[in-house]
C-alpha cells in the first residue's frame, strides 16, 4: 500500500499546488487525519465489508466528509470506490512528506536526560538548521534517561548522537578491537 499511498498523495499534492491551495489543503487534510485516527479500524471494516457496495461507501464519504474542499472530497470518494478508506493515514503521511519538502522543513526529535529549556532547544534548532540546510524545524523534546547525558537528535532518517551512552559504546568497540 505504500506505493499506492504515495500515488494518491502526489496526485492530491500536485492538484493542490496547481490550484494554489497547498497550505489550505495541508490544514484540512491534517484535520481529517486527526479525526480518522481513532476510527481507522472502522474504516478498514467498511472497506472489507462485502455487503457495502460502491454507492454506499461513496454516500458515507459524502455525509462524513461533505464539508471538505472538492479536491479532497474527490480523492476520498475514489478511496471509497477502491476500498482504500482505511489508508487515509498512510496517504496523509506521504502528503505531509511532500509538503515538508516543498517548504524545506522537517520534524526533529531531541532526546535528552531532562526537559531542555526553550533557550537550549533554540540553540540546538539553529545547529540542526545549519547542518541540514532546512529553513524550519518542528521540535519535540523527549526524555530518555538511558542516554546518561548529552543529547540524540533525529531528523528524518538522520541521527546525530552526542550522548554519553553513545560515547561509552564507541569506547567499548575500540577496546574490543584492541584485544
From Swiss-Prot:
Membrane topology type? Peripheral membrane protein
Subcellular location as annotated: Cell membrane
| Family annotation (InterPro entries) | ATP_synth_OSCP/delta_N_sf, ATPase_OSCP/d_CS, ATPase_OSCP/dsu
Kindly give the Pfam families that the UniProt entry links to this protein: OSCP (PF00213)
Presence of keyword Phosphoprotein: no
Superkingdom is: Bacteria
PROSITE patterns, A to Z: ATPASE_DELTA (PS00389)
Keywords of this protein's UniProt record, alphabetized? ATP synthesis, Cell membrane, CF(1), Hydrogen ion transport, Ion transport, Membrane, Transport
Q: Where is it mostly found?
A: membrane
Subunit-level organization:
F-type ATPases have 2 components, F(1) - the catalytic core - and F(0) - the membrane proton channel. F(1) has five subunits: alpha(3), beta(3), gamma(1), delta(1), epsilon(1). F(0) has three main subunits: a(1), b(2) and c(10-14). The alpha and beta chains form an alternating ring which encloses part of the gamma chain. F(1) is attached to F(0) by a central stalk formed by the gamma and epsilon chains, while a peripheral stalk is formed by the delta and b chains.
The protein's job, in short, is: F(1)F(0) ATP synthase produces ATP from ADP in the presence of a proton or sodium gradient. F-type ATPases consist of two structural domains, F(1) containing the extramembraneous catalytic core and F(0) containing the membrane proton channel, linked together by a central stalk and a peripheral stalk. During catalysis, ATP synthesis in the catalytic domain of F(1) is coupled via a rotary mechanism of the central stalk subunits to proton translocation. This protein is part of the stalk that links CF(0) to CF(1). It either transmits conformational changes from CF(0) to CF(1) or is implicated in proton conduction.
This chain belongs to the protein called ATP synthase subunit delta
The protein's organism comes out as Staphylococcus saprophyticus subsp. saprophyticus (strain ATCC 15305 / DSM 20229 / NCIMB 8711 / NCTC 7292 / S-41)
The organism's taxonomic lineage, starting at the top: Bacteria, Bacillati, Bacillota, Bacilli, Bacillales
Amino acid at each position: 500500500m505504500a506505493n499506492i499511498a504515495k500515488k494518491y498523495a502526489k496526485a492530491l499534492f500536485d492538484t493542490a499546488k496547481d490550484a494554489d491551495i497547498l497550505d489550505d489543503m495541508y490544514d484540512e487534510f491534517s484535520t481529517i487525519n486527526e479525526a480518522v485516527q481513532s476510527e481507522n479500524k472502522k474504516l478498514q471494516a467498511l472497506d472489507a465489508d462485502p455487503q457495502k457496495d460502491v454507492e454506499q461507501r461513496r454516500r458515507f464519504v459524502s455525509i462524513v466528509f461533505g464539508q471538505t474542499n472538492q479536491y479532497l472530497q474527490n480523492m476520498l470518494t475514489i478511496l471509497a470506490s477502491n476500498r482504500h478508506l482505511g489508508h487515509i493515514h498512510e496517504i496523509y503521511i506521504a502528503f505531509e512528506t511532500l509538503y515538508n519538502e516543498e517548504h524545506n522543513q522537517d520534524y526533529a526529535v531531541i532526546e535528552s536526560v531532562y526537559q531542555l529549556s526553550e533557550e537550549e532547544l533554540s540553540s540546538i534548532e539553529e545547529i540542526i538548521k545549519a547542518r541540514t540546510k532546512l529553513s524550519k524545524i518542528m521540535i519535540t523534546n523527549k526524555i530518555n534517561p538511558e542516554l546518561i547525558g548529552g543529547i540524540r537528535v533525529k531528523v528524518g532518517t538522520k541521527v546525530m548522537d552526542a550522548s554519553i551512552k553513545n560515547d561509552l559504546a564507541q569506547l567499548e568497540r575500540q577496546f574490543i578491537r584492541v584485544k
